[in-house]
Design a protein with these regions (language model features):
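Helical scaffold of the NTase/Pol beta-like nucleotidyltransferase catalytic core
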Residues: 1-43, 167
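A structural signal for short, well-ordered beta-strand segments
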Residues: 46, 61, 110-114
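Conserved catalytic core of two-metal-ion nucleotidyltransferases
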Residues: 82-118
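Catalytic cores of NTP-dependent nucleotidyl/adenyl transfer enzymes across multiple folds
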Residues: 112, 118-178
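Short histidine-centered catalytic/ligand-binding loop motif
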Residues: 9-18, 64-66, 126-130
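Active-site nucleotide-donor binding segment shared across nucleotidyl transfer reactions
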Residues: 31-59, 65-69
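Short amphipathic alpha-helices in soluble, non-transmembrane regions
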Residues: 73-81
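Short, flexible turn/loop "capping" segments at secondary-structure junctions
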Residues: 4-8, 52-56, 120
Length: 178
């Protein structure tokens, strides 16, 4: 995971990198090996999965599992440690969040949902909509840059500032899929 990651709490936007999908594939392979049979689907989501827009250099991975309680027990007993840490406080998206950290940097966020959870489904819909609507992707990038300039030192406000736009895009994606 060369040159990917940020120190926890730091906010930085970087240009899109062609190797994000390769880095995701490496992570996917590792996670499938660790969680043998506990993953029903795994996807690259978040801004690094949207072609040609600036993003935080952290790979977002969405895992869906049929048995969330078993997944959590397994993670906390067998996986959590120096490299993988679980965010104990609830997330804004309601997911079970695992951080992968190496060399003092968060390299990936692993968002885990029960299979079929709407938050997981809409994360994929958002990614797909943005990749097929380049004009919206550029608007999203412009919003991210504007929020970054305003909230460089406040990652939470930066994230909250994107919420309304993300919800609008998800609504468009849902309507388009009907």
């Amino acid at each position: 995971m060369d040159n990917v990651g940020l120190k926890r709490g730091v906010l930085e936007l970087m240009d899109y990198r062609e190797d994000y999908s390769e880095i995701y594939e490496e992570e996917k392979k590792e996670l499938l090996q660790i969680y043998k049979g506990r993953i029903s689907s795994i996807d690259h989501v978040g801004s690094t999965s949207i072609k040609n827009i600036k993003s935080k250099p952290i790979i977002d991975i969405l895992i869906q599992t049929d048995d969330l309680e078993d997944f959590i027990r397994f993670t906390e007993s067998n996986v959590e440690g120096e490299t993988y840490t679980v965010k104990k406080e609830p997330t804004m998206g309601g997911d079970y969040l695992i951080r992968k950290e190496e060399d003092g940097k968060v390299k990936s966020f692993i968002h885990v949902y029960k299979t079929g959870d709407m938050n997981g489904i809409t994360s994929i819909m958002f990614r797909d909509y943005m990749n097929s609507h380049k004009d919206e992707a550029k608007r999203y990038e412009e919003l991210k840059i504007e929020l970054y300039e305003k909230y460089k030192d406040n990652r939470k406000e930066y994230t909250l500032g994107k919420d309304k736009y993300i919800k609008e895009i998800i609504d468009k994606a849902i309507k388009e899929s009907l």
